[in-house]
A protein has these predicted regions:
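Extended glycan-interaction surfaces of carbohydrate-active proteins
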Residues: 245-283, 300-323, 366-397, 437-524, ...
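Flexible glycan-contacting loops in extracellular carbohydrate-active proteins
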Residues: 134-181
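Secretory/extracellular carbohydrate-interaction modules
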Residues: 22-88
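Extracellular glycan-recognition surfaces and repeat-rich motifs
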Residues: 2-25
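Acidic/polar, glycine-enriched structural segments that form the non-catalytic walls/loops
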Residues: 191-282, 347-349, 358-363, 414-418, ...
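Aromatic-rich carbohydrate-recognition surfaces in CAZymes
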Residues: 202-208, 226, 284-379, 383, ...
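Short, aromatic/His-centered strand-loop micro-motif at the edge of beta-sheets
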Residues: 90-112
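Non-catalytic carbohydrate-binding regions of carbohydrate-active enzymes
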Residues: 419-453, 483-642
């Protein structure tokens, strides 16, 4: 390697104080009485930092090496000095503490500094032994650089130095005895809660949490109360930044609301749908309807314990068996679990759940299969009662359950391939292929160019948002069925001022079932919005010539953001009026913080464009229209054992990590393009 390859270092190397590489050592030489060699390791701003390095002096009777830990303004909170008398010491306040009484020329010393900006103190070790503990010389907010410099900063010239002088500086053409210092194995380890973030810091977004905590009462507390929300979020959620305030606020609001539903049970964590008790809930007030959404959203938490235990509670929390009321609602759980695997990369996570997921799949096969090969479901068991096409006791072939079962079969096929059971994998693949054929042949209404519910042998003859769900699982062939997507931009279809409706607005059945009984005949449901936008993201990313793009996706996400407000505050509830945005259960306690949809999964996979892959490769394709935002960043994303950062910076001047779309892996730049678009990286 060469100095030019050291992208994370600032290097100052004048002629009489050069910097060079000598094998593993970074060598700083100095014979200049008026200058010095300097190298700086640039790091993300960090409050709790451990710095380790090896240092070797070429002499012990002259020369000086200063090692400083500085903030973004150049203030040094702490300084380690190898002085000209052979003493290694650390400055704290006006005095120095000794680290090594007499260091020896040519001997290697391993130095470790454990620094806390919050405590204004550092603990220092040499060769594995504690040598000193000192208060910081200067308080700093955070540390951003580690500086190695051959001598102190010069105090002159300064503002008081005369502009015109009639004499030469003393020894201007003379050199000092050559001093050589070498450093190697420099390692910085942040221990901030968000210490793996490369660009953003949680503290910059904590004011959102403070506002959410104070904007209304906290009458129900689960595992993580409001008082612990900021600490929990700093440790668990990816960080997001953009120039559009409402997007940013909603991103952190939805994480803040999600943790309200994490509940301790006797068998581990569970995740609720309602905070209030519901009579029809399973043990621990759990409801199975939105498990798929819970998995898709929770898969992005940095601590995978939450998702693992939530799923374990569902599948083994009933005396070792699945929860009793799990089959009360349709399930795309196996498919969602496989999508979570695409993020965490944990084969053990998948294999632990596989037997239970296969048992669940078999139960649906045994109870909900029609003679024609499709699956039936009552609309209320889809979580979609009072719908335009179904009924609470109508056993119709709906796009929901059939798409779910296809997705589940495909996921189980992949799980069995991973476990080496290719025969079983092939069986699931054939099951999925058969369902795909039936969905395309029997649920596609050619007249309406839409996937619709099949009532016995007759199409329901009404377009509903559930007709987009086949794309949630990438079922339809390309081009043949694309016309369905025209309906999301058609105001007679699903486009409304406050979101995508659950039934087409032109239908005579639209909003005919009354109000206040959870109707799915047209009002906007975030449950459905999440499914439709996930499907749209798949359609735009995975199909060759989509008739929609980032413009339409961003518009619908923007409306989704705007709709999540009630009485001037961020809000997520059950469902809302499509024309005026009024939450139809908005003042009922049951509706507040309703955990029945995704949002941040759409922000991560859609807006920021991170498309998870089972093999751990990285595809980034942000669905932000050109010219909409000049910058945005998604940081501290845990992905297959790595930390990802996605940056878009039109000019390169906002985040200063380069111009255009940039991908960092573990803080290192691995891919870049000048404009928004697809970026790919394989390890």
């Amino acid at each position: 390697s060469k100095l030019a390859d050291m992208a994370d270092w600032n290097i100052y190397s004048p002629k009489w104080a050069p910097v060079s590489l000598d094998g593993k050592w970074l060598k700083l030489e100095d014979k200049d009485p008026y200058d010095y060699a300097r190298v700086e390791r640039v790091i993300p701003a960090t409050k709790e930092l451990t710095v380790e390095f090896d240092v070797m002096a070429g002499q012990d009777s002259h020369g000086e090496l200063d090692i400083e830990f500085v903030d973004d303004k150049g203030n040094a909170c702490s300084r380690i000095v190898l002085d000209s008398l052979g003493v290694m010491k650390v400055k704290g306040g006006p005095r120095y503490g000794t680290l090594v009484k007499k260091y020896k020329a040519g001997e290697t010393y391993h130095v470790k500094a454990v620094l806390s900006a919050d405590m204004h103190a550092g603990t220092y070790y040499v060769n594995g032994k504690k040598a000193a503990q000192r208060q910081f010389d200067t308080p700093v907010e955070a540390i951003t650089r580690v500086v190695f410099r051959t001598g102190p900063l010069f105090a002159e010239p300064n503002n008081e130095t005369p502009a015109d002088q009639s004499f030469d500086m003393p020894r201007a053409d003379e050199s000092d005895p050559l001093a050589v210092f070498s450093i190697a194995n420099v390692k910085t380890t942040p221990s901030d809660a968000d210490g793996q973030a490369a660009v953003l810091k949680f503290d910059d977004y904590k004011p959102y949490v403070d506002y959410f905590n104070g904007m209304e009462d906290e009458n129900i507390k689960n595992a993580i109360p409001n008082s612990k929300a900021a600490e929990w979020m700093s440790r668990n959620v990816p960080l997001f930044d953009c120039p559009q305030e409402n997007f940013k606020e909603m991103y952190y609001y939805r994480w803040w609301t999600l943790r309200k539903h994490i509940k301790r049970t006797p068998v581990g964590y569970g995740m609720t749908e309602f905070l209030v008790q519901r009579s029809y809930a399973d043990r621990y007030n759990l409801i199975a309807c939105a498990i798929g959404h819970h998995v898709m959203e929770t898969r992005w938490l940095r601590d995978s314990t939450y998702l693992s235990q939530i799923l374990n509670t569902w599948y083994h929390g009933n005396n070792g068996k699945a929860m009793q009321k799990m089959e009360k609602f349709s399930s795309w759980n196996p498919a969602a679990v496989y999508e979570a695997y695409k993020v965490n990369g944990s084969r053990n996570f998948l294999m632990t759940l596989k037997p239970s997921l296969e048992e669940e799949y078999a139960r649906w096969q045994n109870t909900h299969r029609l003679d024609n090969g499709l699956y039936w479901q009552e609309d209320v068991r889809d979580g979609m009662e009072e719908s335009a096409s179904g009924g609470r006791k109508k056993k119709f072939a709906r796009p929901t359950i059939n798409s779910y079962m296809y997705g589940n079969a495909m996921a189980l096929a992949e799980m069995n391939r991973l476990s080496g059971d290719n025969a079983k994998a092939e069986g699931y693949s054939k099951e999925a292929a058969g369902l795909k054929k039936l969905i395309e042949e029997k649920l596609w209404n050619k007249k309406h160019e839409f996937f619709e519910t099949l009532k016995n042998d007759t199409a329901a003859d009404v377009r509903e948002a559930i007709g987009f769900i086949p794309w949630y699982f990438n079922i339809p062939d390309a081009k043949t069925y694309d016309a369905a997507w025209k309906q999301v931009t058609d105001e007679k279809g699903f486009a409304a001022p406050y979101g995508l409706t659950t039934c087409e607005r032109r239908s005579p059945l639209f909003r005919t079932h009354g109000t206040g009984t959870c109707e799915w005949d047209g009002a906007v449901w975030p449950f459905a919005t999440s499914q439709t936008l996930t499907a749209m993201g798949n359609y735009i990313n995975n199909y060759p010539t989509p008739i929609l793009g980032s413009k339409e996706f961003f518009h619908d996400m923007e409306v989704y953001v705007e709709s999540q407000h009630h009485r001037g505050r961020p809000y997520i509830g059950e469902y809302l009026d499509e024309t005026n945005g009024a939450w139809l259960m908005g003042d009922r306690e049951r509706s507040r913080y309703y955990n029945h949809s995704t949002f941040n999964d759409l922000m991560i996979t859609g807006i920021c464009g991170l498309r998870p892959q089972a093999d751990g490769s990285i595809i980034v394709n942000p669905l932000v229209p050109e010219g909409k935002w000049d910058w945005f960043c998604l940081d501290n994303v845990s992905y297959h054992g790595h930390n990802l950062t996605i940056i878009y910076d039109k000019t390169g001047n906002h985040y200063r990590h380069g111009k255009g779309l940039v991908l960092l892996v573990d803080g290192k730049k691995v891919a870049q393009r000048d404009t928004l678009g697809k970026l790919e990286y394989k390890f």
